[in-house]
Amino acid sequence: VPAASVIASRADRPITGETRPDLRNVAIVAHVDHGKTTLVDAMLRQSGAFAERAELVDRVMDSGELEREKGITILAKNTAIRRQTEDGPVTINVIDTPGHADFGGEVERGLAMVDGVVLLVDASEGPLPQTRFVLRKTLQAGLPVVLVVNKVDRPDARIAEVVEETHDLLLDLAGDIEDMDDAALDTMLSLPVVYASARAGKASLTQPADGGVPDSENLDPLFETLLTHVPAPHVDSTGPLRALVTNLDASNFLGRIALIRIHAGKLRKGQTVAWMREDGTTQSVRISELLVTEALTRVPAQEAGAGELVAIAGIPDITIGDTLADLENPEALPRITVDQPAISMTIGVNTSPMAGRGGGDKVTARLVKARLDQELIGNVSIKVLPTERPDTWEVQGRGELALAILVEQMRREGFELTVGKPQVVTRTIDGKLHEPFERLSIDSPEEHLGAITQLLASRKGRMEHMGGHGTGRIKLDYVLPARGLIGFRTDFLTETRGTGIANHVFEGYFPWAGEIRTRHSGSLVADRSGPITAYAMIQLADRGTFFVEPGAEVYEGMVVGENPRAEDLDINITKEKKLTNMRQSSADVMETLARPRKMDLEEALEFCSVDECVEVAPNAVRVRKTILDANARGKERSKMKSRDNAAG
């Protein structure tokens, strides 16, 4: 990647002799679950951001319901930590970016706002693929890095090895970046290392023993390292205003709020500025409200200067990447660029016979489209495209997780939807079909090596590296088509009995790898509507695993279970027992039935086969056939077969 074509290169920032020593803008980047949000909590507590007697909430920056539930950060958020130094107070603006590559658009936006990066790595797991993704973006932007080895008090910590692995990763990534001179390379590799335990709220510059606690009372060594190694923002405080919109938010009182970094000049409440849009047009607008961040809250301010991260209101249609400039002398800043989507799925209104009965109040195409348009405003890494049907849209994103999170958020908001199976977004390069590939990193007990190898061979995976810690666990690196990862998680957890860890990150576009069969079982499909009977389920118990319980309503074409054989089976699950004068307790009947397999949204999307989709409602997630009528399905299958034979 040429260092010139970076996200928000340091070359785009004002190069003047003037700096703001009272400011530091830092992003914390790490892999999912390496303790990033916990570290920010500890930094806030030790800077006195919470009142002594205030009730402390863990992981305060994960404010979204889904974020707390899944333990991952989805949106890039910022907080301001005030720190007293010998030279006076310093405000450290911390951007908490997602550690998951699926939310990469958030990572790129975060990097456009900062002058340095804290790379947080788990003392046992070391740098993982997602760390690689974020670090590559950081190096492209030419930002200095501070390495924080977190969780050093883990019993399985291997601190020295992890530091060495991080250095190797940096060297490897530096090789990918063109025109990087030796001085820049030396600076990058001589990065400072801080050893920390975020949960204990301690950090040290001296390496503790593996599993030991850092030898200081607090996080002061981390704060001092940040102030020394992250440069104060270079600013042009006397020049004309130039500010870049890096994120959006909404408020019930103020409407749309734009989060901006001021690169030059000053911004005042009530000021009229030039709003420079993506289409090249410029419009004069008034800043109705100016807000600055103090700890986790935004407070009104009258004025903000160059180098600061602030929020503004008063421009209803402003979007990410726009520039706010001086009216007399408008000059646009380079827009934020994000990687193209790799996975797509269709999202439309609920078209099943149970539509409107799933506890949702948002069931029309107009509402679905309005919600998807709203998502586009704040989420730069997704695209919404029309399909042949007026009530269905194709949504493209970075990965399966990002799209599943969007659908889950809509479900909780009261939407009833029909969601198609995730597909890959292909490209034609030099006349040949190319598809996205992913780099997959696996950590698993050694005894599952054979099963994992077999699983990935069937998904066109190519092993690139294999190693072990000498602890009975192995580390594998694979490169495989993104298609091969759709539905992979469930199979992988089954094969490793829940003990394996798998993480993946986008690698690039390569030639189409051929057919991949990710599911080797069929579906049990209801052939008529009605309530499920225990009698029918007992008669059909040997046919496979059920997803439903007696008494629930089904409709024709609904998938009620999994057939171990590789074909679909239409069954009558509503059949009633012929009445006799023999009596049987219903409790006895229930005991003979196996417990049904419950699937959440992600599992249902993974289970889906090509001719199936998922019905999503606030109180239910069901897999169903796209074509509900069994006869119509049979005709479509015959048509496909004859088409394949003709092509062959």
Model-derived segments and spans:
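Acidic, low-complexity intrinsically disordered tails
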Residues: 1-16, 622, 628-648
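P-loop NTPase switch module centered on the Walker A-proximal segment
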Residues: 2-121, 125, 161, 165, ...
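Conserved structured catalytic cores and adjacent interaction surfaces
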Residues: 21-38, 101, 124-136, 142-155, ...
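Residue-level signature of catalytic and energy-coupling elements of molecular machines
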Residues: 33, 39, 71, 94-96, ...
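Interdomain boundary/hinge elements
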Residues: 56-58, 173-193, 233-244, 280-293, ...
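Canonical P-loop GTPase G-domain recognition
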Residues: 144, 154-227
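Conserved nucleotide-binding/hydrolysis modules and their immediate coupling elements
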Residues: 242-345, 355-359, 369, 392, ...
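A short, contiguous, amphipathic alpha-helix enriched in charged residues
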Residues: 352-376, 590, 594
